[in-house]
């Protein structure tokens, strides 16, 4: 995504 930790929960 765009945020700093927006993709860690995948």
UniProtKB/Swiss-Prot annotation:
Instruction: Give the similarity note.
Output: Belongs to the multicopper oxidase family.
Q: Which cofactor does it need?
A: Cu cation
Would you say which domain of life the source belongs to? Eukaryota
Q: PTM details?
A: Glycosylated; contains 8.47% carbohydrates.
Q: Does the keyword Zinc apply?
A: no
Which enzyme class, named as a word? oxidoreductase
Location(s) in or outside the cell? Secreted
This entry's Gene Ontology molecular function terms read: hydroquinone:oxygen oxidoreductase activity; metal ion binding
Transmembrane annotation, as ranges: none
Q: In terms of pH, how does activity behave?
A: Optimum pH is 5.3.
The cofactor note reads: Binds 4 Cu cations per monomer.
Keywords for this entry? Copper, Glycoprotein, Lignin degradation, Metal-binding, Oxidoreductase, Secreted
EC number(s) per entry: 1.10.3.2
Q: Which reaction does it catalyse?
A: 4 hydroquinone + O2 = 4 benzosemiquinone + 2 H2O
Q: What is this protein called?
A: Laccase-2
Q: How does activity depend on temperature?
A: Optimum temperature is 60 degrees Celsius.
GO cellular component terms listed in the entry, alphabetical order? extracellular region
One Gene Ontology BP term is:
lignin catabolic process
Q: What else is known?
A: On the 2D-gel the determined pI of this protein is: 4.56, its MW is: 62.03 kDa.
Task: Name the job this protein performs.
Answer: Lignin degradation and detoxification of lignin-derived products.
Q: What organism is recorded for this protein?
A: Cerrena unicolor
